[in-house]
Every structure is written in structure tokens, then in C-alpha cells.
């Protein structure tokens, strides 16, 4: 996973975003156990408290859940995962369209760039 962090956003927020992307893309499957806080902190090169905050955000959002001493797991609610995926896709499309508008691209120019 890419752990290069930008300076324009808190690291815990970027961790939350990357872990969400890993869940919706299937890197972490529904029901799969996530690496421990310490393992993620070492892998990402950040403080364990930062990872804990990111995982707490994911729990609050319902994408992961804790099982006392067993660790954290990805939700098995595939509708929740699908909704998170659509939310991310919608944000990215919005960013793309804003960039194209800033460049002065017309609707037809934008459509010609999209190859599905």
C-alpha cells in the first residue's frame, strides 16, 4: 500500500482514506482481520496513536468492527462497502470535473477524454 503522506491533510485522515480504499477495492475482504495497530504503524511509518484514530474513524463509519482481544475486522455488510465505494467514486469524479472546468474544457472535450 502507498504510504506517502501529503502535508495538506492530517495523516490520520489520509490513513482512513487509504484503508477505506483498501477495503472497497478488495485488498481487505469482508470479514477479514486487519493488521494490528502496531503492524500498520510500522508499515506506514507513523505513530500508533495516529493509526488508532484512523481505525476508530473506520469503526464509527461501520467499515470495521472490533472483537475484544481478536482485533479488528472488515465489515461483512457488502452494501456498506458498496456505498463507501460509490462515495469515493463520486468524490473523484467531482474532483476530475472541477479540474476540467478549471482548464476550460468543454463537455465534449471531457467526454472525448473518457475511454471506458
What are these regions (language model features)?
Residues 78-103:
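Conserved segment of winged-helix/HTH DNA-binding domains
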Residues 1-8:
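N-terminal intrinsically disordered/low-complexity leader segments
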Amino acid at each position: 500500500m502507498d504510504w506517502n503522506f501529503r502535508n495538506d491533510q492530517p495523516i490520520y485522515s489520509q490513513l482512513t482514506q487509504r484503508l477505506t480504499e483498501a477495503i472497497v477495492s478488495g485488498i481487505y475482504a469482508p470479514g477479514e482481520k486487519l493488521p494490528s495497530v502496531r503492524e500498520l504503524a510500522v508499515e506506514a511509518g507513523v505513530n500508533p496513536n495516529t493509526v488508532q484514530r484512523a481505525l476508530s474513524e473506520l469503526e464509527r463509519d461501520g467499515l470495521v468492527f472490533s472483537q475484544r482481544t481478536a482485533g479488528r475486522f472488515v465489515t461483512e455488510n457488502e452494501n456498506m462497502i458498496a456505498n463507501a465505494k460509490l462515495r469515493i467514486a463520486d468524490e473523484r469524479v467531482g474532483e476530475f470535473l472541477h479540474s476540467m472546468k478549471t482548464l476550460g474544457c468543454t463537455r465534449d472535450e471531457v467526454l472525448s477524454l473518457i475511454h471506458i
